[in-house]
């Protein structure tokens, strides 16, 4: 009796970004037969010492992203501020990209996000698009509001609370969203997974507790304490957001 064992080559998986989330991705990837690659500007980033191969480079730079990805089987991200143009070309050349570049274009741009919500009737605060400070200065009647720069803002950057016209000096002289301020009882984050077949999975929602001076996350409470009917609403909205994206 002879048995034949065939070993398939390990899949080469790239991650754009080497921060804490990239490190957690690598910890999960350790359970699978994959070879991991990370692209990040900092040699001492949290993910640098857990991946099989580390490349120093700017995840927003076309050449850096394209050259990093052209020998890989699949690429994913730990942050949305990446060069989507390079990912589109890599996808056309056969590299699997998760999430798809077409989805990333919306995810990384708050203006496109708001228009996406509006198109698909997903609940969201009222908003106005401002292309520069001159346009922002005409919106005193819309206050109080939150000004969010269209692209590039994260971890407290690119967000300003505007209560009076004098606060317009803190606004952004770039394409941005001016979002009507709402009273927040709790801020909830809901993770959803979707595969090509359209199947979805929901993870327990978490409550986000922010430092309101720095607009930075202080703590997450998991699972969030929610009434059942509120949980159903959270899940329904999250599923609507994900299902309207084309796989």
Where are these regions (language model features)?
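ATP-binding N-terminal substructure of ATP-dependent carboxylate-amine bond-forming enzymes
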Residues: 6-103, 107-108, 112
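Short, hinge-like loop/turn segments at secondary-structure boundaries
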Residues: 53-57, 93-95, 115-118, 145, ...
């Amino acid at each position: 009796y002879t048995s034949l064992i065939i070993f398939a080559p390990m899949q080469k998986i790239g991650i754009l970004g080497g921060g804490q989330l990239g490190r957690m991705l690598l910890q999960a990837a350790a359970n699978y037969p994959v070879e991991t690659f990370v692209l990040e500007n900092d040699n001492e980033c949290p993910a640098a010492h857990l991946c099989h191969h580390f490349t120093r480079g700017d995840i927003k730079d076309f050449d850096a992203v394209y050259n990093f990805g052209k020998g890989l089987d699949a690429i994913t991200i730990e942050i949305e501020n990446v060069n989507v143009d390079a990912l589109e070309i890599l996808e056309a050349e056969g590299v699997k990209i998760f999430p798809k570049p077409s989805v990333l274009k919306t995810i990384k741009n708050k203006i496109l996000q708001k228009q996406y919500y509006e198109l698909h009737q997903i609940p969201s605060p009222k908003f106005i698009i401002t292309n520069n400070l001159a346009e922002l200065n005409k919106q005193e009647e819309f206050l109080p509001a939150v000004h969010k720069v269209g692209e590039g803002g994260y971890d407290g950057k690119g967000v300003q609370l505007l209560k009076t016209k004098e606060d317009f000096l803190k606004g952004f002289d770039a394409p941005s969203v001016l979002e009507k301020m709402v009273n927040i009882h709790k801020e909830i984050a809901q993770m959803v997974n979707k595969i090509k077949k359209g199947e979805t999975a929901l993870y327990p929602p978490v409550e986000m507790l922010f430092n309101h001076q720095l607009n930075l996350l202080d703590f997450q409470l998991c699972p969030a304490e929610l009434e059942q009917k509120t949980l159903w609403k959270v899940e329904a909205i999250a599923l609507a957001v994900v299902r309207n994206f084309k796989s």
